[in-house]
């Protein structure tokens, strides 16, 4: 089959499972396609399924799930053939997760059935940018939406450890986890360099390296970010006191935080990030909501690398 539909039934607290029959009905006008349903307990099942399908000749991968499943599918396509595979395989998203942040950034319907109907009507493919994270040990991880470190990674870690929180609280889970992590996190010394700009050194609560504008279940972290402009929006939250961080959360959701004196933003296509001098604790990195490693790391852009059905 030239098309594979990957389904994560647990996405969105079961939203994907509840929508599956209607999604299949909406996709009925398409040529026959295979369906892969992920099972709990497997490591990155959507990634393996996408890789195997592309190696077998698939040219279109559809994902009914959340941002994490979509990111896994992206990495699976890349694992099957690098940039060449990204160029020839289209990715279609049927957003059913808790946050559905990338869909908002990319202009995709945030209802999975509506997105499926658009695909069945012949949604046009558009070229979008893809972020790349490179680690000193040679590992590489791609991301669609946002990569970050600091308190934001601690939030992702908490949601990974307690998935029942997302199942029970839905999008509110991101806010609850943010308040909890923000209250217990202290800024740590980091060094950040964006393109050829001077290095930013100092206490850091969080850094978001954004291809899309929203993350964390509706936080408008990078209001100027575009998924097809070839640039990251880099947002650094500096030496924010715990109380100040929590109080500032409404501004983060509204996208008005750039005026805060401890928030700095810039644009670039290559970012180098490392722990500050003397820092020994791991500073974890999350990408599209999944912990993928720790600093130091290089973040770069693959402009117009992916064919996105939207």
Task: Name every feature range the model reports, one short phrase each.
Residues 12-16, 216, 308:
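Short N-terminal binding/cap micro-motifs at the start of the first secondary-structure element
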Residues 67, 207:
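Short conserved active-site loop signatures built around small residues
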Residues 17-19, 74-77, 104-106, 220-221:
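Short amphipathic alpha-helical segments
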Residues 7, 37-38, 65-66, 94, ...:
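Small/polar loops that bind or transfer phosphate-bearing groups
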Residues 29-30, 40, 78-205:
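Catalytic core of DAGKc-family lipid kinases
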Residues 148, 152, 208-222, 291:
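Glycine-rich phosphate/pyrophosphate-binding beta-alpha loops
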Residues 194-201, 220, 226-227, 232, ...:
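ATP/nucleoside-binding phosphotransfer catalytic cores, i.e., glycine-rich phosphate-binding loops
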Residues 1-64, 71, 75, 113-116:
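ATP/NTP phosphate-donor binding region
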